[in-house]
A protein has these predicted regions:
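Conserved AdoMet
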Residues: 33, 37-97
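Hydrophobic (often cysteine-bearing) scaffold residues that line and stabilize catalytic clefts
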Residues: 9, 45, 82, 101-104
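Conserved small/polar residues in nucleotide/adenosyl-binding loops
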Residues: 105-114
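Residue-level signal for inorganic ion chemistry
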Residues: 13, 49, 108
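Short acidic alpha-helix initiation/capping motifs at coil-to-helix transition points
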Residues: 25-27, 98-104
Length: 114
């Protein structure tokens, strides 16, 4: 994992969602821990992190339906990192107003994890 000061919002969200969706951790515990760890971030950034994590989890079934409508490989068969990146990005595109449809940080997060 990168140094905390170098992590972007989306990398923090990705790590949190991996813990919750792929490792089965409780969302409220993961989010509490993450928000305490990054309490130095501005409130707007912490709100974005929390809203994106909670929204992705709450809309997971619909998001998976949308992804499965377009993807050759269905979500249950995807690698966990790819599945989580797609869920996070799909949530942002469908539900958040002020997020660009294509975000460089998604690519960067994927590149840093190989």
């Amino acid at each position: 994992m990168e140094d905390a000061e170098e992590m972007t919002d989306r990398e923090i969200i990705l790590d949190s969602l991996m813990e919750i969706l792929e490792k089965g951790q409780y969302s409220h515990l993961v989010l509490r821990s993450v928000l305490q760890k990054y309490d130095y971030l501005p409130k707007q950034q912490r709100s974005f992190i929390k809203r994106t994590c909670e929204g992705t989890i709450e809309n997971k079934i619909y998001i998976d339906y949308v992804i499965d409508s377009f993807a050759k490989t269905k979500t249950p068969k995807m690698k966990p990192l790819i599945r989580t990146l797609l869920r996070m990005g799909t949530y942002q595109i469908l539900f958040l107003d002020k997020i660009p449809a294509v975000s460089y940080t998604h690519l960067r997060a994927h590149e840093t994890r190989g």
